[in-house]
Amino acid sequence: MKRVLTALAATLPFAANAADALTGAVERQPTNWQAIIMFLIFVLLTLYITYWASKRVRSRNDYYTAGGNITGFQNGLAIAGDFMSAASFLGISALVYTSGYDGLIYSLGFLVGWPIILFLIAERLRNLGRYTFADVASYRLKQGPIRTLSACGSLVVVALYLIAQMVGAGKLIQLLFGLNYHIAVVLVGVLMVMYVLFGGMLATTWVQIIKAVLLLFGASFMAFMVMKHVGFSFNNLFTQAMAVHPKGEAIMSPGGLVKDPISALSLGLGLMFGTAGLPHILMRFFTVSDAREARKSVFYATGFMGYFYILTFIIGFGAIMLVGANPAFKDAAGTLIGGNNMAAVHLADAVGGNLFLGFISAVAFATILAVVAGLTLAGASAVSHDLYANVWRKGATERQELKVSKITVLILGVVAILLGILFENQNIAFMVGLAFSIAASCNFPIILLSMYWSKLTTRGAMIGGWLGLLTAVILMVLGPTIWVQILGHEKAIFPYEYPALFSIAVAFIGIWFFSATDNSAEGKLEREKFRAQFIRSQTGLGIDQGRAH
């Protein structure tokens, strides 16, 4: 039973230890000129791509979805690039470095969310939607209320995720490049705005693809060099790691990540359903031409991510063997220079020298840029498409909608920079956990039930969705992370760190109860529209850019 609970707790990749890669204390490193030069090459390449993309962005369709011309393979790479964060690369390899086997469960467990997207969501989402998941949620329900709720859910998730990434960017760049924190945050903010403002989804997609290729290449090379060192024998790798690790054989045993069964379930559910409710991930399914390509996207993305997280396991054990046993990477007190989260970076130095160290440092920074670009575009589309064009000013022209989207990108960029600076010394590890909980408690139930439950009504979706969102936020505030660690109270009112188990239940029960008891004429009409929606969700008939599949 403990192994099952350990695996469940492991499924939130950014929580606890992995989040520390972006939020823990950092020690500024000497200026790394190789890393800076390689990063500048990456920036120049991506700025050229943005310029190239800007010449091809002529319509709303181009801006939001790259014209629907991205292939399943390209989109799979871009999704992987959007999802493989610096926290998972540095944090999970650091967790393997310190805890051994637990890190494998931690790194692979989060993939549980992707089969849900593949089998339940990808095809119907592509057939029913155009630009945002609110298109799907509001397909047969009242546009105004549902789009407002979906946009609020999206913006809260984007804001929390964005703050965590910006603070993480500043601290990571302090670590890797020796640059000032404020300069780093401003640099990320400016580049993020340029990619999205001028290049839209096309530039964002190619930034994510390039980042994914670089990260997979870098991690593959590190894993190859580690395995070469041990004669390509996993037995030798584990034996040598056990010989030098302070915990000895204990690193090959599970346990130690779980406080209690409720926390384990809450973490597991938060990621499993949260992944299927992240607006910047869902938006990527509208960049392909049809449902077949959407399914292929998930297939490729899951393959790339699964491969990457297996590599982090090898990298973690390689770090135990080549970094942990080498005094050159330790300070006077015997701890790893820069902290345990630098294990993968030090391993890059150990297997590839200073040049490869510079490459991995630049890739870590590129990783953050790819993630924040996707978040910014998702936030901007929620405001311009869902709120402005479909709620506040119905009948707005494409030009007006694009103008609002680009103004929103600028505002999001400024706000992200200011909040990144404001939260510099705060514990922001909880923010990504909260983002996943809200995505799982508000966005996911509405998307799933709008596509699969014929009796869903606007009243049920609105009340249940808001209940889920508010429950997630309130329980998080009353929990040990915010109530005790941040606000300084003696004891938490809500005893568990993550609220997903409770807030998801509240959302689904609320949606079911208030839909089932809705006897209004509007509710009856919405139920009758389900058959037409079901036919389109299966066939794609009538969809823009739709092709046979």
From Swiss-Prot:
Subcellular location, principal: membrane
Keywords: Cell inner membrane, Cell membrane, Ion transport, Membrane, Sodium, Sodium transport, Symport, Transmembrane, Transmembrane helix, Transport
Function: Transports acetate.
GO cellular component: plasma membrane
Transmembrane segments: 33-53, 76-96, 103-123, 149-169, 183-203, 206-226, 262-282, 303-323, 355-375, 404-424, 428-448, 463-483, 493-513
UniProt record, GO biological process: plasma membrane acetate transport; sodium ion transport
S-S bridge residues: none
Record GO terms (molecular function): acetate transmembrane transporter activity; glycolate transmembrane transporter activity; symporter activity
Taxonomy, superkingdom: Bacteria
Record flagged with keyword Protease: no
Protein name per the record: Cation/acetate symporter ActP
Membrane topology, record value: Multi-pass membrane protein
Location in the cell: Cell inner membrane
Signal peptide bounds: none
Sequence similarity: Belongs to the sodium:solute symporter (SSF) (TC 2.A.21) family.
Native source organism of the sequence: Enterobacter sp. (strain 638)
InterPro entries in UniProt: Cation/Ac_symporter_ActP (IPR014083), Na/Glc_symporter_sf (IPR038377), Na/solute_symporter (IPR001734), Na/solute_symporter_CS (IPR018212), Sodium:Solute_Symporter (IPR050277)
CDD domains: SLC5sbd_u4
